[in-house]
Amino acid sequence: MFSKKPHGDVKKSTQKVLDTKKDALTRLKHLRIVIENAESIDLKQFFDQHFSHIYYVFFENFVTIEASLKQKGHKSQREELDAILFIFEKILQLLPERIHQRWQFHSIGLILKKLLHTGNSLKIRREGVRLFLLWLQALQNNCSKEQLWMFSCLIPGFSAPQSEHGPRTLDNLINPPLNLQETQVTIEEITPLVPPQSGDKGQEDLTSYFLEALLKYIVIQVKSLEWKNKENQERGFSFLFSHFKKYYLPYIFPNICKENSLYHPILDIPQMRPKPHYVVIKKDAETNEAIYCTKEPFIKARVIVIRWLVSFWLEPKPHTGPHIPGMEGEVLPKNIQRAAASLVSREESKNDNADKTDRTTEPEQSHSNTSTLTEREPSSSSLCSIDEEHLTDIEIVRRVFSSKRSNVNFVTEIFRQAFLLPICEAAAMRKVVKVYQEWIQQEEKPLFMQEPEEIVITSSDLPCIENVTDHDISMEEGEKREEENGTNTADHVRNSSWAKNGSYQGALHNASEEATEQNIRAGTQAVLQVFIINSSNIFLLEPANEIKNLLDEHTDMCKRILNIYRYMVVQVSMDKKTWEQMLLVLLRVTESVLKMPSQAFLQFQGKKNMTLAGRLAGPLFQTLIVAWIKANLNVYISRELWDDLLSVLSSLTYWEELATEWSLTMETLTKVLARNLYSLDLSDLPLDKLSEQKQKKHKGKGVGHEFQKVSVDKSFSRGWSRDQPGQAPMRQRSATTTGSPGTEKARSIVRQKTVDIDDAQILPRSTRVRHFSQSEETGNEVFGALNEEQPLPRSSSTSDILEPFTVERAKVNKEDMSQKLPPLNSDIGGSSANVPDLMDEFIAERLRSGNASTMTRRGSSPGSLEIPKDLPDILNKQNQMRPIDDPGVPSEWTSPASAGSSDLISSDSHSDSFSAFQYDGRKFDNFGFGTDTGVTSSADVDSGSGHHQSAEEQEVASLTTLHIDSETSSLNQQAFSAEVATITGSESASPVHSPLGSRSQTPSPSTLNIDHMEQKDLQLDEKLHHSVLQTPDDLEISEFPSECCSVMAGGTLTGWHADVATVMWRRMLGILGDVNSIMDPEIHAQVFDYLCELWQNLAKIRDNLGISTDNLTSPSPPVLIPPLRILTPWLFKATMLTDKYKQGKLHAYKLICNTMKRRQDVSPNRDFLTHFYNIMHCGLLHIDQDIVNTIIKHCSPQFFSLGLPGATMLIMDFIVAAGRVASSAFLNAPRVEAQVLLGSLVCFPNLYCELPSLHPNIPDVAVSQFTDVKELIIKTVLSSARDEPSGPARCVALCSLGIWICEELVHESHHPQIKEALNVICVSLKFTNKTVAHVACNMLHMLVHYVPRLQIYQPDSPLKIIQILIATITHLLPSTEASSYEMDKRLVVSLLLCLLDWIMALPLKTLLQPFHATGAESDKTEKSVLNCIYKVLHGCVYGAQCFSNPRYFPMSLSDLASVDYDPFMHLESLKEPEPLHSPDSERSSKLQPVTEVKTQMQHGLISIAARTVITHLVNHLGHYPMSGGPAMLTSQVCENHDNHYSESTELSPELFESPNIQFFVLNNTTLVSCIQIRSEENMPGGGLSAGLASANSNVRIIVRDLSGKYSWDSAILYGPPPVSGLSEPTSFMLSLSHQEKPEEPPTSNECLEDITVKDGLSLQFKRFRETVPTWDTIRDEEDVLDELLQYLGVTSPECLQRTGISLNIPAPQPVCISEKQENDVINAILKQHTEEKEFVEKHFNDLNMKAVEQDEPIPQKPQSAFYYCRLLLSILGMNSWDKRRSFHLLKKNEKLLRELRNLDSRQCRETHKIAVFYVAEGQEDKHSILTNTGGSQAYEDFVAGLGWEVNLTNHCGFMGGLQKNKSTGLTTPYFATSTVEVIFHVSTRMPSDSDDSLTKKLRHLGNDEVHIVWSEHTRDYRRGIIPTEFGDVLIVIYPMKNHMFSIQIMKKPEVPFFGPLFDGAIVNGKVLPIMVRATAINASRALKSLIPLYQNFYEERARYLQTIVQHHLEPTTFEDFAAQVFSPAPYHHLPSDADH
């Protein structure tokens, strides 16, 4: 019989137990052996068979022990009692069926009474309670009333119920007080078995002690009864539990509410509860913190029950017992411990574990969300496979709780009671919160949370479904199956035996009620609703702010609840009712917690952390707002709720946290708006990534590929910004689309894709997928974005869905694994220290949830519109439907193009709030989302339905149009025209195609929502139908339900869509009410500061719309644009506030200026501008300088360049305001901006002679005509140029002066202040700040181009400027030489080069005019200006010490003082510290190890520049430009040209073998090559020899020096061939050789006479004599010598001994000779003359006086090939001893040739290449810009003004990389002076007919560092359009409507300031080309100054010359030198034709 036989004598023991002869003790011993060694099945059988024997043995022994205990009571007896009770327990456990039949009823009852006696020790009493409960469990309904009464008295401390015998206590029940008479039989009095011992521990709180025991034993003994029918175990628990509820609960929970039901929940929001009275009960032993309690009765009991109930739903590990609080460390009786095989011991160990675990884990968390605790509810996964045998106690208990509605309601109600506990019991509340959290978060819900079903599935249906898990089944099916799986246990229970047990209270229900009672599925939504309501009680308890511990606990609890709310908001699918419940509760909670009187609020200011409100403000606002947004994405939220939100939030604006959260929300909503309406990702904008985009390009159909790389912002507060891809939109949609096979097919397609994509997200749970969305990538990039290249269609709704998924799936799976959201339960239950992390978790969702609906359709729904049947008529009548006075509204959301095409003006100033969303019917077709009209709209259809609406439905209030300037929360409702059509196709209703041919996003019409419609039978126009329903090629028409629109528009599509995003953005923007009503100035300022940021984002969106993504085509203008002026009503109103709100006002002014200085897509209307100008007028004249500063700062520089209608009305205000800024003492004022504004106005007065403008001295609006605007501007600019303390501002002022001077000179206004302006510029040349001085120098440099006009204005001005430059250099030189700063030296160099240009611009005649110094010490000698020039240059070369010698001193500044010029005008010094120069060169600071080079360079900077100027003047003054034209500065001739000894085309070593060439060095600075070449014959006019007799060879001298290369040909002249007789004296004539024909007439400013070519010699001179005066041309009265001397003086003025005085005028007598001495000399000469005469007369005929007659010599041909060269050198004195030191030979080697070639390749002028682009209207990409072949007339005129056209094929000047082979064009503009060459790479001049030529063109243009862009496009030009690493400076020219030109300069930050044009300048067309050219040249110079070790052309040339001289000079003796000069190389014969 017994299978387990470790004990050899089990059988024997069995027999001995049954042996009646044995004594009771022996039988007991053997009974124990049997119990301990038998299997439980065998044991049960044994007990069943021999129950009588067993009970007898037990009872006998019990009686014995009882007697001995009363006698002795030793410990041994107590242990024996334990052993006996062990047997007793086994009897109760193994014989439940018999006991149920009341077997041994009284005997057992008596024993239990003895154990329960209140006189026993606590341990025995507790053991009695345990056994009593076992007995009751077996008896169940067969017990008597007495047992139930005893049960009701088991726990002391509860008030005893009354009976006829007095109060019914336990003592009374054990020993009833019977009123017996003495004669009657009395019952034996029951006495205690084991009274308390002296060492026993007492219990303070017996109620808690026994309550905990009772609750513990009710549960852990459920399974210990070995019933044959296992269902009796559940019944036993149910029986005890129902009586516990009956007898104890009314006391423990006096306010328990029976009506509360999960099935018919009462969802009224609770009221605020007052703060309980907390008292300290003790201090914590460890932390010493006070522990508080409230003195409520039974509060502890309440906590115990709650914790007990919680323990069934929270288990630390699977299969462990529940934690029963208070049982820690308890030791159970030894018999239980010993019975290893028994169930009891198992349970004991379980309890110990549970206790330990719970104690340790309460502060921490089970970090697993996959715990099986709650998975063991009845469900297919567990119960189909688990036998009833193996159910744990807890599972049984849970089954009971889940068996019928009343029990479920009980659990719910107790949990509600938990939320009503005082905060000192937070630990219990935490556990309840944890339970709810697990229920909400875990996959498998408790049965009552599963969805109710109508169909009952019998148990026989279950097996086939049991383990189905198929991820590919559709969402709905999957969910249904899940629910089916969950039902089988319930059905099992129901079908087998629940019906029998009906009710344990004895009330029998009829069948239908019972069925209802047992159908416990309430569904998740009901549980969520009840939880939301009940948990709100925690918030609605008045906080104990004064007790820190309790405040911490309260905060912690609130945050835990909020965390669950947040989880629900983000992750849980909720229905409309639940959402509304959530929002209502959050609203009330927010209001109740945070609303407080202002006094109370101020009291806690700065101590917010000491109040619950202060701590919760941020989390509450965040949760409320995010929940609100998520709700609107999922269900339709009524207008009333929105109104509530508005009223609550607008009343809480004194919370800074609200402003912060609102700003964060708006930031995210703006991103969402960008994504869904404009298809832009703000974190990855096209403009930010145009360079990388080319590689990333998708080739797919319209896929918005811009959103591929997206960072995931893990924050809850942004979590709503992306749709949840899986939020079962299809399921919601199916309500309207069931039945259509196409629908089902489409739905399954979408679902599969959705599941595939999202499977990997968050946690690996198949069914959760639809509630999650973590990925930034999912929805949006696939659906939300339109391809950047295509115009934004009027609706972005589409059904084009399959394509993107294949691309996205792999990526999403990969990336999202790393973004899984950790389960939110991980922190709950932890101490409040963990809560911040939780909040982060919660916040972790804020940016993450992706497009739910997007997963179903790309950006669906703006097209989801409802269309009235009379649509076509409405379209036709559009123009007639507008009321006369309606301003009409193409708002900023419309396309600029379409707005422009109508005569309407924007609604910015519309009386009802300047709503930028307004539309009248006329414009709906341009609007992406329906009737968000500024007039009316219904929240149901906010964005999608243009149907007729009743008055109640005019949902404008606070939601769509905001009426942001209205004080009230609701907005005015206006009449709404019934004829409104919201159309989504194009106006012709034809499909819209993108330029790339990809499928356009076409809209679909929405569900026609009958509730809101009067016309139900709508027919779509056929054509419209096609456009609206256009579907992609790969889906049939039927595959997508076409009637869907967003829930917000009354449809079924959830998630973000264009209309939803728009409406949500609008509503949230205005959710604070009128922001100008915010009382706290700081918060007001904070809000306005954020509005600035918000506007920036909108502006960014606008800038990124219509951007070419491939840079090959320009997209058409966007149809929808952001409402940049939407904020203006708030801003306008803010400017009217008091000074208390100053900071906010400043932000408002700033934003007004920023808004209005942008290019306006939609021109503002008259009313708006009137309001705007009024505000600006008041602001500019405001007494508060900060306001003036703000306006000036943010209006500059573009304000006047926009050409706003009537903007010139503000000119006077701006001049006055800018003047105020300039004259203020504050350095941080917007000084530069003020100067830029003033500078932009200098050209206006000449355009507008009389300017109507607001009067700046009157605050009222009064328009006056101003004629003195010019005077006012120039007065302000002049004073700024003198006194401005800020360096950059002073520079701008000087530039403005320069521009103004040019403007006045061009208009020939002869303005008197030009002199003063020139004076200021000239005085600034010596300003201490070198940057300012440099700018002044640049201005003078620019004026060189206006010399002729200056001479007209004031003839002596140019000469005066040269004198000023000379005097300034003289003044600066000594200090500069001593300075170690390179900037100082660079300034003098700039002045020298400026001086050179001025000298070259004036005719020689002017320069030679005598200069009369005004200085007192001046000697009486006259000197010419040229003389002074050379003196100052000499000083610069040899050092300022030269000036100490009066002979070498040029002139001082004081010499120049005059009425017009004050050289010592006072200039205020700058207040800002100068940038610290290091003595090192700025240009070379990047390369440290080059100090020596730098110092050398620095020391020589001025000297080299001065030498260059000198050589330049010597070579070019009076000669440039020569016949070759300005492009030719230096000779192109080389040593090999015309050389018969050299056959090579370039310099080659054979030259060294030539006998006719020699190379010399002169003065160590100049290279001279002498070559003897053949003379040319038969030249017209005689060629070089001018027809005179000459030798057959000429001498060519090629000179290379600092300023270039020059070639001189010389011939020896013998005389005229016809004349014989005396030979003519030998003479040489030098001339320039080989000049080419001029390409262009020379453009020198000198007025030259005709060029006379005489005998082939080109001469330019001022006509004085026709020819050289010869004997045959002289008239009789003329003196030949006189004429010759005059001729020489004119043609060679350098020969004049005295400036300006002809050579034939006798010189005055020397000063040192007196008249007497003069007479003596004359007499001596006359005497000598007389004596000589007499001698001749006397000896004339002497033979000795007569000479032999000479014959003419016979000519000899020289034999040497170098003869004439050495003859010339000899004549020039080069062979003399005194020249020996300065004249040397060069070594002849290949290196020399290489150096010479290199030297010749260097430029001899400064060169610049500058790109010029033409941008036509609408061009935004490089391709269309580069393919322009011409431009507008204004552009062509401008290009013509930059220079003159040169033919590239024969251009001999600087080419700038252009080719002569016509591949880079035929002609190009070119400009040159003798010092500068500029070539313009004009894009319209270069060919663009092939890809190759385009590439070449881009290469040329792109490599230029300065770009000039002429833009006629409506948008500002962007740097990135022409992709290049160069283009460091962009000078962009925008033609304005008033024929002026606005200049925008974009430069890299490191580029130093340059002028004359500055960013924001506005100039006249007449000065534009010269100004732009000068600016481009200065920009190019500024860029070159940044290059480390950069050298100017002359520095480079000087270095090359120096290198050649150093390395190739050959020192020789005189003999060797003479030999080399005599014969450069040995030769054997002359060339064959040498003797011609």
Curated annotation (Swiss-Prot):
Example of a GO biological process term: regulation of small GTPase mediated signal transduction
Positions carrying Phosphoserine: S711, S721, S773, S797, S860, S861, S864, S986, S990, S994, S1000, S1004, S1478
Minimal domain that binds to TCF3/E12: region residues: 1327-2035
Effect of N1076S: In NEDHRIT; undetectable protein expression
Gene Ontology CC annotations of this record: cytoplasm; nucleus
GO terms assigned for molecular function: GTPase activator activity; protein heterodimerization activity
UniProt modified residues of type Phosphothreonine: T754, T778, T1002
Keyword Phosphoprotein: yes
Compositional bias annotation for Basic and acidic residues: 345-365
Tissues in which the UniProt entry reports expression: Widely expressed.
Illness the protein is tied to: Neurodevelopmental disorder with hypotonia, neonatal respiratory insufficiency, and thermodysregulation: An autosomal recessive disorder characterized by profound neurodevelopmental disability, muscular hypotonia, feeding abnormalities, recurrent fever episodes, infantile spasms, and moderate dysmorphic facial features. Brain imaging shows thin corpus or dysplastic corpus callosum, and additional unspecific abnormalities including gray matter heterotopias, ectopic posterior pituitary, signal abnormalities in basal ganglia, and stratum subependymale.
The protein's assembly and partners: Component of the heterodimeric RalGAP1 complex with RALGAPB. Heterodimerization is required for activity. Interacts with the HLH region of TCF3/isoform E12.
Name used for this protein in its record: Ral GTPase-activating protein subunit alpha-1
Gene responsible for this protein: RALGAPA1
